Design a protein with these regions (language model features):
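Proteins enriched for Cys/Gly/acidic motifs involved in redox and nucleic-acid/cofactor modification
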Residues: 1-203, 213, 243
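Conserved AdoMet/S-adenosylmethionine-binding subsite of the radical SAM
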Residues: 54-62, 205-251
Length: 251
């Protein structure tokens, strides 16, 4: 995989931006070079969003633009459109080589290796707990304000929303995993931490006999002297409990 290069295009929400940053860190740790232009990259990754109805149409248009460059590229579609359309993507556009759901992007290096056997690669399993184990020490600094995913998925199944089908059921990262990431980010200059989740205030870490809610996580992260501000998005009113409200006054 050495001497290869990649380009990542992100669509949609802040969590996709965060996921693209993690994909970039993982690939760079494997020796790939990040490019700012698809023309100069061997691998083009589209990290997709499926909230809006025309999201897939925009994706296929962008793939068409890459194909018009006339250069052989490995094309990977990751994220929520990949999860929603699954193997159907290969039928719709034969230039797609990899289809990867939003809970499996840590498998991308292995899929690239397997692709050398000339088999198209797909993984849309909901294995969200595994991907957070791949916290690269070479994580790229995000700047003064840094995003950290603490929760994914949703159990609400609102009639207008596709999130439970593309991001899966609610899952909360262990506090230790989040703390380790915040520590790395703070060492790289982060002063503000933005917690991300599809239903962020449904956060509930039950690992290792814990029962930690978002209020407990905020309290734990506030102990980092270098972290001056904590924000979170997106919240749901049904999970806005009194303890969390009081934490806004205390911290």
């Amino acid at each position: 995989m050495q001497n290869r290069s990649f380009y990542v295009k992100s669509y949609g929400c802040q969590m996709n931006v965060y996921d693209s940053q993690k994909i970039t860190s993982i690939l760079e740790s494997k020796g790939l070079k990040n490019k700012l232009d698809p023309k100069s990259a061997d691998l083009v990754i589209f990290n997709t969003c499926n909230i809006r109805e025309k999201a897939a149409h925009k994706l296929y248009s962008d793939i068409g633009r890459v194909n018009k460059l006339g250069l052989k590229k490995t094309i990977a579609v990751v994220g929520c459109v990949a999860q929603a359309e699954n193997s159907e993507m290969f039928r719709k556009n034969k230039s797609i080589d990899i289809v990867l759901g939003p809970q499996s992007y840590h498998l991308l290096p292995k899929m690239l290796d397997d692709l050398e056997n000339n088999f198209k690669q797909i993984n849309t399993d909901f294995i969200v707990n595994e991907k957070f184990d791949y916290l690269s020490e070479q994580m790229r600094p995000q700047g003064v304000s840094s995003m950290v995913t603490i929760q994914e998925g949703c159990d609400k199944f609102c009639s207008f929303c596709v999130v439970p089908y593309t991001r899966g059921p609610e899952y909360s990262r262990p506090i230790k995993s989040i703390s380790d990431e915040v520590k790395l980010l703070s060492q790289k200059g982060a002063k503000e931490i933005v917690f991300l989740g599809q239903n962020v205030n449904a956060y509930n870490d039950k690992s290792n006999n814990n029962d930690a809610k978002l209020s407990d996580l905020i309290r734990a992260i506030s102990e980092f002297d270098s972290v001056k501000r904590i924000r979170y998005t997106t919240s749901h009113p049904i999970n806005m409990d009194e303890k969390l409200i009081q934490e806004h006054k205390i911290i």
